[in-house]
Amino acid sequence: MALTAEEKQDIIAKYATHEGDTGSPEVQIALLTKRIADLTEHLKFHKHDHHSRRGLLLMVGDRRRLLDYLKKVDIERYRSLIERLGLRR
């Protein structure tokens, strides 16, 4: 269910803007997107898990705020990330 260390490192390596980058908006959004996808799959089988559903909604809100920030700061990085992650916007 949770991200393994290997999965996390793969995502960080794929979306990092420079060596050792773990906090850029791109990396944070990519990690949240993976967690959101995993939790969405969990909720398909456990429809009454309302505690996890609330966590999912909080993560979606966090990702939305990070995407809005990235869009405001650098629209080209935003468009590139949306395309790479396959998010609708």
UniProtKB/Swiss-Prot annotation:
Listed GO CC annotations: cytosolic small ribosomal subunit
SMART domains in alphabetical order: Ribosomal_S15
GO molecular function, one term: rRNA binding
Keywords: Ribonucleoprotein, Ribosomal protein, RNA-binding, rRNA-binding
Keyword rRNA-binding listed: yes
GO biological process, one term: translation
NCBIfam families with a match to the protein in the record: S15_bact
Function: One of the primary rRNA binding proteins, it binds directly to 16S rRNA where it helps nucleate assembly of the platform of the 30S subunit by binding and bridging several RNA helices of the 16S rRNA. Forms an intersubunit bridge (bridge B4) with the 23S rRNA of the 50S subunit in the ribosome.
HAMAP family in UniProt: Ribosomal_uS15_B
Subunit structure: Part of the 30S ribosomal subunit. Forms a bridge to the 50S subunit in the 70S ribosome, contacting the 23S rRNA.
Protein family according to the UniProt entry: Belongs to the universal ribosomal protein uS15 family.
Protein name (Swiss-Prot/TrEMBL): Small ribosomal subunit protein uS15
